[in-house]
Amino acid sequence: MAKRTFESSLSKLEKITEELESGELSLEGSLKKFDEGIQLAQFCNEQLEGARAKVEILMKKDGKVQAVPFEEE
């Protein structure tokens, strides 16, 4: 099985959203897609949180480059 990536998960989540919005799935099919979508959304959120934790802003202070943790505004 291929390694799951943020991009592939987001793409699959968008496809699931379109399928659910179409109204053409059975109740059982909709529930399965909904469950899969929740799992994909959680994975994407975890990936974003991990990326946010790694983001650093380089700031110049006293002629030296200093790494500063990213702070969301």
UniProtKB/Swiss-Prot annotation:
Its EC number is 3.1.11.6. Gene3D superfamilies: Exonuclease VII, small subunit. It is an enzyme of class 3 (hydrolase). GO terms for molecular function: exodeoxyribonuclease VII activity. It is found in: Cytoplasm. GO terms for biological process: DNA catabolic process. Its main location: cytoplasm. The keyword Transport does not apply. One of its GO terms (cellular component) is exodeoxyribonuclease VII complex. The keyword Nuclease applies. It catalyses: Exonucleolytic cleavage in either 5'- to 3'- or 3'- to 5'-direction to yield nucleoside 5'-phosphates. InterPro entries: Exonuc_VII_S, Exonuc_VII_ssu_sf. Pfam families: Exonuc_VII_S (PF02609). Keywords: Cytoplasm, Exonuclease, Hydrolase, Nuclease. It comes from the Bacteria. Heterooligomer composed of large and small subunits. Belongs to the XseB family. Bidirectionally degrades single-stranded DNA into large acid-insoluble oligonucleotides, which are then degraded further into small acid-soluble oligonucleotides. This is Exodeoxyribonuclease 7 small subunit.
